[in-house]
Amino acid sequence: MLEGTVDYDPLEDITNILFSKESLNNIDELISITRSYKKQLQEDILKEENELKEHPKNSAEIEASLRKVFQDFKETQDVSASTELTISNLTEGISYLDIAKKNLTHSLTLFQNLKILTDSYIQCNELLSQGSFKKMVSPYKIMCSLAENTFISYKSLDEINYLLSSISRLKGDTLSKIKQNYNALFSGGNISEHDTALTMELREGACELLDCDTSTRAQMIDWCLDKLLFEMKEIFRVDDEAGSLENLSRRYIYFKKILNNFNSKFADYFLKDWEMAVRLTTTFYHITHKDLQTLLKREFKDKNPSIDLFMTALQSTLDFEKYIDVRFSKKIKEPKLSSCFEPYLTLWVSHQNQMMEKKFLSYMSEPKYPSNETESLVLPSSADLFRTYRSVLTQTLELIDNNANDSILTSLANFFSRWLQTYSQKILLPLLLPDNIEVQDKLEAAKYTVLLINTADYCATTIDQLEDKLSEFSGNREKLANSFTKTKNIYDDLLAKGTSFLLNRVIPLDLNFVWREFINNDWSNAAIEDYSRYMVTLKSVLKMPALTDASIKQQQEQPSTLAFILSQFNRDVYKWNFLDKVIDIITTNFVSNTIRLLQPVPPFSLAGSKRKFETRTVVNIGEQLLLDLELLKEIFHTLPESVSNDSDLRENTSYKRVKRHADNNIDQLLKFIKLLMAPLDSADDYYETYSKLTNNNPDSAVWSFVLALKGIPWDLALWKKLWSAYNLETDDTDEGSRPDSNRDLFIFKWDKVLLGQFENNLARMQDPNWSKFVRQDLKISPPVMKRIVSTPQIQQQKEEQKKQSLSVKDFVSHSRFFNRGT
């Protein structure tokens, strides 16, 4: 428990001993033990002190032994130093002998290498005099290696310096000798063609010798290339007629002869890894590139440069580059010769106008409609136009080497836009029948109009891809986009005009007869036994053939106008969108003719004025119209079935959209007819029916017009009674001041003009009581700054049709098929 250390902490033992209250009972015993232990320790200390006093001699003995240890250590050091000196004296002679051995070995090696160098030099000298390059390769390589790597550091020695000078002269003589042989070869002296021995001597001998020194080899290659191209450089000087731009093609032809001659006669005399043909072509490129820059700069100093000459030179250069690229698999790294023409490429782009003018002459003379009915229903000239564009674009990108050149790309974009606009004006727009010419043959007019739409769509969507392609190489995409903006708008306008023509001038030719039958029908005596005659005619007019071979053959002679138009569209998206618009036109016509049939004849509320139809008759008419709507719904549901022969047609999103659109229109018509038939016996019941069918429509003009169409007499008391029930649930908003965009016009949204006429006539009632009711209760006032004049029905329909002009964004999808017609 008690520790014999100076760091002893008594608190730990005290804590352990007195860890509980019970331990206090033994406190006396603990104190007694502690005192006894303390006494024992004091006795031990005294005993140790006494022993130290009794034996002081032990310290002296320890000191003496330490002195003895240090003395022995000093003696050992002295012996060690003496031994080391003795050993050094013994090995000194051995070190001298080792150094002498190394020097002797090095001297022997040096003299051996010197002998080899001398022998190689002598041997090379003899072989050179004999012209034996192949045998000379091995000693020559040894000689060059030793001279450059071993003895160059001993050049200060006269003998070595003399030998190295002799070797240098030998190298020069070797190069001269090799040049003599190649000169004789190129000049066609007494050397026989395809001399095998000479071939081996030059290729495996002379070329191997030249490979020993990079600078010598480069010098020799340049000398050979200069020899091979000497005549060409002399003939085609830029200051001579032969070297002019007019004779550029002759320069290329001449070089081809040089290249072919080299490959057939001289290529075997050089090592393959030298690639002499590639070097020869690269040197020609370098020379011609410099000459071309001079010639083109000189040509365009003139205010009237020859564009034909420029184009001829450019075309011959492009043809030559293609030839070289094919021959050498694009190994030529020298800048292309066509890059010299790049600063003047805007002239090249403008020169393409001549080509396009010729193209347009052929476009205007060829048949507008494809001769083969199975062909894509676009003008063949449009596909040819974009093939031409693609060719021009490809050539331009080759000329600028696929690098960004905004000025050229902008010129190209303007070129494309210009001729696309010309194409729309000269080729496409004439396909559209002018407004001042009556449609004589609706199928013929429809055929060419759909051809216009298909082609304009092809052009419009392809313009986007053309713009994207140009943008890939341009640093100014916005500027390129601006170049195409006007063109895109022109084609969008063409699409809108073509679609509007079909909807407003072709389709109505059939529908007008239907609505004439509607007007001529004896509505006062509606029998309500079968569908009305006008509706049967409408079904016949809109009849769509089933998509089977047999039925198509049956319908080929006289298809319905709608069926013919849908069959001519090049893409299903146009068919679906066109059906959407036709459904809206029929719905609008149905509403307009129903309103005209039932609307009161002004002036209103005159004494003794009678309504066209009594309320009871209007109910009978409504019942007949409900029956007719059943057939109209059937007709609308039949239309989408003929768009495509796809087995999954009913799962098609467009099919579902068109069918849902038709159902929504029919539902609106049903609510309108049911409202016309709603009884007026109870004002509250009528209000409940009205609110349910019009979705709580708050517009007082709509409420008034519906009452007027129901044939209710001009009995102010009856009108106020019905109004009181209606007015309790509506707010006090001034309907006359509410903007049309915020008004819920119910069924009259399809013919706002008729609603406006009714409001105008109602607000101008002369009877003071009626006038007060209209202005204060109904809050209807004449339209401000606007005069609405009643027009004959046919003229009114034409005004409605003009409203059908479509935005191309509502009718055209943005799919792309740039590669069509390729």
UniProtKB/Swiss-Prot annotation:
What is the similarity comment for this entry? Answer: Belongs to the VPS53 family.
Q: Which InterPro entries does the entry link to?
A: Vps53, Vps53_C, Vps53_C_sf, Vps53_N
Gene Ontology CC entries for this record: cytoplasm; cytosol; endosome membrane; GARP complex; Golgi apparatus
User: Which named protein is this?
Assistant: Vacuolar protein sorting-associated protein 53
- Source organism's superkingdom? Eukaryota
- PANTHER family for this protein: VACUOLAR PROTEIN SORTING-ASSOCIATED PROTEIN 53 HOMOLOG, VACUOLAR SORTING PROTEIN 53
Per the UniProt entry, what species is this protein from, by scientific name?
Answer: Saccharomyces cerevisiae (strain ATCC 204508 / S288c)
Where is it mainly found? Golgi
What is the primary gene name for this protein? VPS53
- List each coiled-coil range: 34-58, 460-484
TM stretches of this protein: none
Q: Which membrane topology term applies here?
A: Peripheral membrane protein
